[in-house]
């Protein structure tokens, strides 16, 4: 029973749950960026350089022979993947930069001294009265 309770404690920790949520959101974000690059960014770039569809850019290393498929080096898809990576990396960089700035602002904010309670004020007055009585000749 010890292993199961340890696993439960591990799995329920906030860090593990936060990490799982981050992975799921990251996977969804990756799909959005891939669609953005493939469907929005690359078509205008292809038009600018002569109507080229980057997904179709490839070099055939060995032509198809009979039932054997062709050996193709699909460098256009690789270019799209590089652009995907750059956009995702930039978005993550900007997110981390914002989080770090917020953390810095929290750390820099001065902490005000606590306001004394009524009891503390009364104790201070009693102390001052006792000091005054002790200093009288």
Swiss-Prot record:
Entry keyword annotation includes RNA-binding: no
Membrane topology: Multi-pass membrane protein
Location(s), subcellular: Cell inner membrane
First and last residue of the signal peptide: none
Keyword line: Cell inner membrane, Cell membrane, Ion channel, Ion transport, Membrane, Transmembrane, Transmembrane helix, Transport
Chain ranges passing through the membrane: 9-29, 32-52, 54-74, 79-99
Annotated GO CC locations: plasma membrane
GO MF: mechanosensitive monoatomic ion channel activity
Entry keyword annotation includes Transport: yes
HAMAP family: MscL
Free-text function comment from the UniProt entry: Channel that opens in response to stretch forces in the membrane lipid bilayer. May participate in the regulation of osmotic pressure changes within the cell.
Protein name: Large-conductance mechanosensitive channel
Species annotation: Pseudomonas fluorescens (strain ATCC BAA-477 / NRRL B-23932 / Pf-5)
Gene name linked to the record: mscL
